[in-house]
Amino acid sequence: MKKILKISIGILLFIGLQSANAASLESTQKIFDEARGICKTFLKQCEPHLVISNQWQAVTHKEKDIYITSDLVKSLTEDELRAVIYHEVGHAVLRHTTREANWLMSVSANKTYTKEAHYNLRRAHEYEADRFASYTLKFTRRPNHLPEALFKIVPPEYWNVEFPTHPSIIDRVHRVKTIINKGGF
């Protein structure tokens, strides 16, 4: 298992997050602090963690721990990193892990489970987390950075692909831009 570290300026210096457009050391710490604050606003406690890895990944675990890999942090601008972290905060605040577990228990009790229904639920949660991030980013006056981050994270040949757990990037970006332009949550 990869070593998991709480983010700090010293750790960031150690792994060398000094690429040309990457978020600065101070801004990365600030974004992680903002994430904690947003969670507290919704009476949730969440903690961002940095995972030293050459993969590009951000995930929420048990609705309180947000993990983001060092290479993903290195690849994003400050505003794109904020958008990705706010998306993960959305999963925590909206209790997606608990909701999915409750759904799985109810369908297993009724013996009505299908993979497609489960995948639809997971994709719906992605849309909800995107909506949460977009709404939150509107208050920072930086709403367009979630689409930019999504396009950066996923290679162009996969933009139209719908994955079992995630909608296509094109569809997600279209929905986010609709939220940005029309407002609403």
Protein language model annotation of sequence segments:
Residues 22-185:
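A Zn2+-metalloprotease active-site environment signal
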Residues 1-23:
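Classical Sec-dependent N-terminal signal peptides that target proteins to the secretory pathway
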